[in-house]
Swiss-Prot record:
GO molecular function terms attached to this record: DNA-binding transcription factor activity, RNA polymerase II-specific; RNA polymerase II transcription regulatory region sequence-specific DNA binding; zinc ion binding
Family: Belongs to the krueppel C2H2-type zinc-finger protein family.
Pfam families the UniProt entry points to: KRAB (PF01352), zf-C2H2 (PF00096)
UniProt name for this protein: Zinc finger protein 791
Compartments, record wording: Nucleus
Gene Ontology, cellular component aspect: nucleus
Native organism taxonomy: Eukaryota, Metazoa, Chordata, Craniata, Vertebrata
Biological process according to GO: regulation of transcription by RNA polymerase II
Length: 576
């Protein structure tokens, strides 16, 4: 049986605190203390029925808070001091008994002090006032110690310092939790999944993942949360409060996590590194989730369909597929989203915000994924490698499409002519030949395009803009893909090799045209005479015969020709 000290079942006041109590509050205190003595007597201890009121009649008596000292000590060893001896103890009959019950809500407590603190949560039923008021923010406290701890949030004082890493803390409890991260101590284990946690409060919050309990409900929208900190952050979406500001650019955020994530764009600091692949993270929790990619662990399982997830937030978002819940609604267009990241990215469509800026060229992006992919154009990094031929790519989609060259898969088929394609982009481009229609139209010449990027590149043929310059020879290009291909003329790289004859090519179009010599394929057919060609350039030259088009003119005599070979032959006449 556990032994408890008298302080465990008592509540006390300093002389100053007692003076602040109203007569009705003093009466309540006496009633509660007398009830305590009755409880003690009922479990076998002999207690004299004290006159509680007499404790406070003598001004010289010293009532002390819970410091291990006597609750009430008379100057000359009065009867009061005898009755309140700190060495007295009682024995619990049954472990886990909670004898102190709140008369307002029925909640029970092990200690009377816990009950008295709880009673203050009920409006109009405070045991006593909160005499300690903060001058900075006007927050009031019942206890001097609580007030002193709060003051540190304004002064910045952090008296608890970790000997391992030097990190400092305002409060003792977070300091204790932090120390466990060094020794790896996690004494609180979940009975459902076996996950171990460093503190009891974290275990309680974690257990709600299994039970589905969400005790914290937003009064504005009714949304419920499993954790008190989550509802505090959520409430700011209604109030518009953003208390965490970036010191670099002044941008404000609703949560501390958000501002730390944002800070990466300035300093790139990621202290938590994966031992498997070297990837770094801002928070240890992010690293733990990432490590599950390597271990294959997926501890969060959907009760509806059985699908498992590495991260608790992922399962929460997934569950909305079953419920149909889309809590994030755009105020501009009314579109709703099930996940906050998708909603935030969408909002930038309206605001035009592009928070991710490239330090090399100044180009800005609305998504961090787009920004990271763009960075590879400067670093030359191509992390996605084909296991068949060793070719590397910037993007995973490019690798996926490339693999179809090896497998022969062409999943996109034209319903008009039954022609098939390895990529959706090629298929859409082909469809324009049938429909003559595309969503992006050039204002100068009326040419249509499927993608806005293709239109932008095309517009440069009108403006003459060539933003991509070769560092080797200074030649400039209107498109990034053109400069990549051009660089091969300097390096000698010829990545496109014919398996039939071994001939290699710099340009993919040259390689494709060459392959048709072996296959005999001639996809470009003249509508006028029915003649077919393996190369598009040959087809274009041929159509000039029917159109009587002669775009190539001799500078010497002005004679015009439809093809370059005829012009070259003619030029030899002048050079004789």
């Amino acid at each position: 049986m556990d032994s408890v000290a008298f302080e465990d079942v008592s509540v006390s006041f300093s002389q100053e605190e007692w003076a602040l109590l109203a007569p009705s509050q003093k009466k309540l205190y006496r009633d509660v203390m007398q009830e305590t003595f009755k409880n003690l007597a009922s479990i076998g201890e002999k207690w004299e029925d004290p006159n509680v009121e007499d404790q406070h009649k003598n001004q010289g008596r010293n009532l002390r808070s819970h410091t291990g000292e006597r609750l009430c000590e008379g100057k000359e060893g009065s009867q009061c001091a005898e009755n309140f001896s700190p060495n007295l103890s009682v024995t619990k009959k049954t472990a886990g008994v909670k004898p102190y019950e709140c008369t307002i809500c029925g909640k029970a407590f092990m200690r009377l002090s816990s009950l008295t603190r709880h009673m203050r949560s009920h409006t109009g039923y405070e045991l006593f006032e909160k005499p300690y008021k903060c001058k900075e923010c006007e927050k009031a406290f019942s206890y001097l110690k609580s007030f002193q701890r709060h003051e540190r949030s304004h002064t910045g004082e952090k008296p608890y310092k970790c000997k391992q890493c030097g990190k400092t803390f305002i409060y003792h409890q977070p300091f204790q939790r932090h120390e466990r991260t060094h020794i790896g101590e996690k004494p609180y284990e979940c009975k459902q999944c076996g996950k171990a946690l460093s503190c009891s409060s974290s275990l309680r919050v974690h257990e709600r993942i299994h039970t589905g309990e969400k005790p914290y409900e937003c009064k504005q929208c009714g949304k419920a949360f499993s954790c008190s900190s989550s509802i505090r952050v959520h409430e700011r979406t209604h109030t518009g409060e953003k208390p965490y500001a970036c010191k670099e650019c002044g941008k404000a955020f609703i949560s501390h996590t958000s501002v730390l994530t944002h800070m990466i764009t300035h300093n790139g600091d990621r202290p938590y590194k994966c031992k498997e692949c070297g990837k770094a993270f801002i928070f240890p929790s992010f690293l733990r989730v990432h490590e599950r990619i390597h271990t294959g662990e997926k501890p969060y399982k959907c009760k509806q369909c059985g699908k498992a997830f590495r991260c608790s937030t992922s399962i929460q978002i997934h569950e909305r597929i079953h419920t149909g819940e889309k809590p994030y609604k755009c105020k501009e267009c009314g579109k709703s989203f099930s996940a906050r990241p998708a909603f935030r990215v969408h909002v930038r469509v309206h605001t035009g915000e592009k928070p991710y800026k490239c330090k090399e060229c100044g180009k800005a992006f609305s998504r961090i994924s787009y920004f990271r992919i763009h960075e590879r154009t400067h670093t030359g990094e191509k992390p996605y490698e084909c296991k068949k031929c060793g070719k590397t790519f910037n993007y995973p989609l490019d690798l996926k499409i490339h693999k179809r060259n090896h497998t022969g898969e062409k999943p996109y088929e034209c319903k008009e002519c039954a022609k098939t394609f390895i990529s959706l982009e090629n298929f859409r481009r082909h469809m324009i030949t049938h429909t003559g229609d595309g969503p992006y139209k050039c204002r100068d010449c009326g040419k249509v395009f499927i993608f806005p990027s293709a239109l932008r590149t095309h517009e440069r043929t009108h403006t003459g803009e060539k933003p991509y310059e070769c560092k080797q020879c200074g030649k400039a290009f209107s498109c990034s893909s053109y400069i990549r291909i051009h660089k091969r003329t300097h390096t000698g790289e010829k990545p496109y090799e014919c398996k039939e004859c071994g001939k290699a090519f710099i340009y993919p179009t040259s390689f494709q045209g060459h392959m048709r010599m072996h296959t005999g394929e001639k996809p470009y057919k003249c509508k006028e005479c029915g003649k077919a060609f393996s190369l598009h350039s040959s087809f274009q030259r041929h159509t000039r015969i029917h159109n009587y088009e002669k775009p190539l003119e001799c500078k010497q005599c002005g004679k015009a020709f439809s093809v370059s070979t005829s012009l070259k032959k003619h030029m030899r006449m002048h050079n004789r």
